[in-house]
């Protein structure tokens, strides 16, 4: 298939990547896009951290990240992991490591399935307000320090068959990257590639990469440039997508979707996190909704419903809620609720079942494109359930 054919195809063609194992969860183009999140409890509060991890896993997070800003937090992860497993929860755990974190990362790597580092902070020097430039010699000297500091962690992760996320944040680029490339997607990409090349030199390839920013256009440019740069240099590592600090409510969800869904539609992205200033478990339905809307995963009923207009023959919003309440547990079905027969049958042609206003007070029920029966409006929802039962596709709610 040519690039032009792919552009106009109705299915998304994902960028081909290697598979990276995080515990027993596979990340990469041969596998479904993975949903993950991060607890907001203090890691030193063992009971609260364990409860947060289990709660996220039960909500559908397939990987859970925990912050480890100190050695005490890193050591606590051993107890946390044991307690999580004792509760029968097998979700893979990721440790988040930032400022000058090699010792922390070396400690916590024993207790988790993946370590996340921030290239801009991993070898951190306080910025000099009087600095005017970085010479090539100074740039290279810091690069040598990074290599020396990073190598023991890479070796440990390689030998233990653990994973690493090279997680760049637009807001925390190293001073030398800012001087050399500016506060740009190019600076983000070069920050990541410096660490990618070290891993490659040390024959470690269990890597996932993220390029997060709080503004969707910056994030989009950085991920696209990262993918192109890896392709040029012969690397095929998976991408972890996210818009950092997206906020809360409708806007936070829309902002995250604008960034994540745009890249997924381009075929980029192998695991996602929607970052909201809310309880972490509220991020999970947004992730699955993004994936389902793009046809990348199907984890819920797909409802097709018209927006309502003057032709609508019943209270469409009310009926849609009733249909959803009755059928939302039937994962895998497509159900259409359409207000009239003008557009209804055509727009819902791909649905498994249709509920369409036929005439005032009368509902037509469809199986695919075929009209099966007409029923009084007040019997419509129950008749739809009965039709699904007749087809052997009904299961009782849990």
Curated annotation (Swiss-Prot):
[4Fe-4S] cluster binds at residues 306, 309, 340, 347. Keywords: 4Fe-4S, Iron, Iron-sulfur, Isoprene biosynthesis, Metal-binding, Oxidoreductase. Its EC number is 1.17.7.1. Pathway: Isoprenoid biosynthesis; isopentenyl diphosphate biosynthesis via DXP pathway; isopentenyl diphosphate from 1-deoxy-D-xylulose 5-phosphate: step 5/6. It comes from the Bacteria. GO terms for molecular function: 4 iron, 4 sulfur cluster binding; 4-hydroxy-3-methylbut-2-en-1-yl diphosphate synthase activity (ferredoxin); iron ion binding. Binds 1 [4Fe-4S] cluster. It holds the Pfam family GcpE. HAMAP family: IspG. This is 4-hydroxy-3-methylbut-2-en-1-yl diphosphate synthase (ferredoxin). The lineage of its organism: Bacteria, Bacillati, Cyanobacteriota, Cyanophyceae, Synechococcales. The gene is ispG.
